[in-house]
Structure formats: structure tokens, C-alpha cells
UniProtKB/Swiss-Prot annotation:
Protein's gene: nuoC
Name assigned to this protein: NADH-quinone oxidoreductase subunit C
Subunit structure, interactors included: NDH-1 is composed of 14 different subunits. Subunits NuoB, C, D, E, F, and G constitute the peripheral sector of the complex.
EC code(s) of this entry: 7.1.1.-
Signal peptide (residue range): none
GO cellular component entries: cytosol; plasma membrane
Family annotation (HAMAP family): NDH1_NuoC (MF_01357)
Subcellular location: Cell membrane
InterPro entries (UniProt xref): NADH_DH_suC (IPR010218), NADH_quin_OxRdtase_su_C/D-like (IPR037232), NADH_UbQ_OxRdtase_30kDa_su (IPR001268)
Amino acid sequence: MSPPNQDAQEGRPDSPTAEVVDVRRGMFGVSGTGDTSGYGRLVRQVVLPGSSPRPYGGYFDDIVDRLAEALRHERVEFEDAVEKVVVYRDELTLHVRRDLLPRVAQRLRDEPELRFELCLGVSGVHYPHETGRELHAVYPLQSITHNRRLRLEVSAPDSDPHIPSLFAIYPTNDWHERETYDFFGIIFDGHPALTRIEMPDDWQGHPQRKDYPLGGIPVEYKGAQIPPPDERRGYN
């Protein structure tokens, strides 16, 4: 594969199309400590890469063109199904509308010129300050036939955390979707048995969300009461 076109690196975080979703202050996003190092004054933006321009470089253009053609046979326009195409760090990510995710995945798997027959699971991400798109599901795909890689990304709001399940297309996503539901609260519609897989069935909340409290128990040391971690300092 030839390297992606440098112009496509407009998808990088410092490009004009990049999206700032949060601003973190202090070292590791922690505030309220007795820091005297000066690192407590750090201010850092959390930035998501923006859309990349054509040509993307390498086999990326071929994937996008063939997927667009396959979707047209389904009477779906590529621009209606894919919100943006991002080339960042030599990787291709398609941000897909959640209601059209199964149709995009089906075409990626079944089209002879695409043949992304392997889905390596699904990962959840929580951006609490990205209003209306707080929850993200990320699917790494691999074409064993053509030795190509691709990533699909879908977003949903906290208020409506529903994303169509890909279990019928990639059955190996069974446990991965359960784990993402367990830890992030994303509801995969159509999954045959969407139950917790790591936490107890009666557990409250979803532990890998950014707004989930750290918890803990108070500790007594030499007569002093030390509160649980999430009450000692502020995390953003």
C-alpha cells in the first residue's frame, strides 16, 4: 500500500475541520490538588479529527468508491450513510449514521471487491461534552481476502443510546456488544441476549463512562478520616 496522501492529513486534530469536544485543565485532567509543580495550570483541548479531503491515498479511495457504488445498488447515497471520512495516522475511519450501520456493514462484508469478512469487535467511547453525540461505538474491520483494514464509527446521544446490533452480520460481536453495553450503556437493538457480561446483573450504572463515580470507602489513618477517591479531588 502506498502511503496516504499528505493532503488527506487534514483529518488530523490541528486541521481547520477538527472538532473540539472538551478542554481539560491540570495534569491528567485532575484539579483540586495541592500541586506546586506548575502542571496544574496546563490547559489542553480534546480534539477529534475532522473530515479528510480527496485523494485519501493508498487503497482508501478504492474502498470508498466501491462502497459508494454498492450502496447505490441499495438505493442509498454514500453521503446519506457516511457522515465523514477521516484519514488519520495512516488509518481510514468511516463515521456512519447509526440507522444505516447494518446496511453499510453488510455491503462491506458481502461485496467481492470489499470482503471485510472479519469484525474484530466493538469498543465504546464516552465524550460527555460532545452534546448529542456523547456515546461512540467503534468497529475495526479486516479484509482477509484483500489484506485491508477499515474502521467504522457510530455515535448516539446519552438520551437515546441505541445503535443497531451487528450480530446478524458478524456473529462474533455477540460478547463484544454485551461488554460495551455493560460498561458504557449502549443498547444494541436486535442483539439476541443483551445482558451484562462483566458486572453483576443488578449493578447500577456503567463503569467506563466518564461520569461514573470512582467510588471507594472512607479510610481512617491516625484518627483522620480520608474520603473515597471521587470525593478527594475533581476530575474532568
